[in-house]
Amino acid sequence: MLIAKNQEGNLVLALETCLKRKESYSCPGCQGVVLLRHGQVMCPHFAHKSLQDCQFFSENESAQHLSLKAALYKSLVNHGEKVSIEKVLSELGQIADLFVGDSLALEVQCSRLSQQRLRERTCAYHQAGYEVRWLLGEELWLNGRLTDLQRDFLYFTAKIGFHLWELDLKREEIRLKYLIYEDIFGKVYYLTKAWSLTENLMTVLRFPYQAERVETYQVTQRKKVSHVIQRELMGKNPRWMRRQEEAYLKGMNLLCLSDQDFFPQVRFPESRQGFVQIRQSLEGFEKLFKQYYRKRHFSYRQTLYPPTFYAKIENNRHN
């Protein structure tokens, strides 16, 4: 933890150079005694003398987590933002890593947590009228496939589609992976944009809503899809076993379908339990996406667009 109360009851930041180890400090959550620690690996921080009675803070914070919180805090302060670090939200029974203005929580997530816990924490913020942005550390970065947990970190806007945020301590940057699409075998495609942590972070976080340029990219779809599905079925892949069963119930066999029957192979990501961070209905955009491809000729090259493009195409047809 980076914040504590001093003997006068004022909140102090561990990063302040004037603090002394011999002084007495307490946890703003449980009021228990905390100690100021300095190390060669971790930045200055406070640690509980005994954690038994604290329901707010944990002692398993990594050096990455502490350093990223500190870097974000310094950047926001330098750009004149009203920001609190490790703000105790007693009505929610939780702590926001950073709280900007009156309604935005920033959560630095460097390790895995249960999907249920993520859903609970996110819903608590939403029910209290707060917005939350989860910023992912290295262990949770998106690579070739979306894990179930990563799906629960996805955000969506009409301008850049599905996206998520990452933090890179080594490069000292915040990274946006956006226009995220997923093919029928689970491979993901996306664009990447990065900013230095010294830039105006609030301007950065507004980018998904204010992006003006329509960005696109092309992907190549697989050939002989039924052969790939056959391998997946032989390997007892649960996803394809379920899809084949659904096809049988409709009197179909996936292995008898052509590549054209699977067009387009690259589509919007899906979540069987429902997306945690996305509160708006995506049904309209999904419908527009399908309508667009129903009118397209089959091709192994697929161009991926932001959701606003499909809406614009449909509007042009009616005008």
PLM regions: where:
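Non-catalytic C-terminal interaction segments of nucleic acid-processing enzymes
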Residues: 154-319
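Short secondary-structure capping/turn micro-motifs that flank functional sites
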Residues: 91-93, 141-142
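Conserved catalytic cores of phosphodiester-cleaving nucleases, focusing on short active-site segments
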Residues: 72, 96-114, 125
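Short catalytic-loop micro-motif centered on adjacent basic/acidic residues
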Residues: 85, 105-109, 134
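N-terminal cysteine/histidine-rich coordination modules
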Residues: 1-76
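Catalytic cores of nucleic-acid endonucleases
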Residues: 110-165
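A short acidic/basic microdomain associated with nuclease active sites
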Residues: 73-92, 98-101
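Short beta-strand-loop-alpha-helix junction that forms the active-site gateway
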Residues: 103-119, 228-229, 233, 240-242
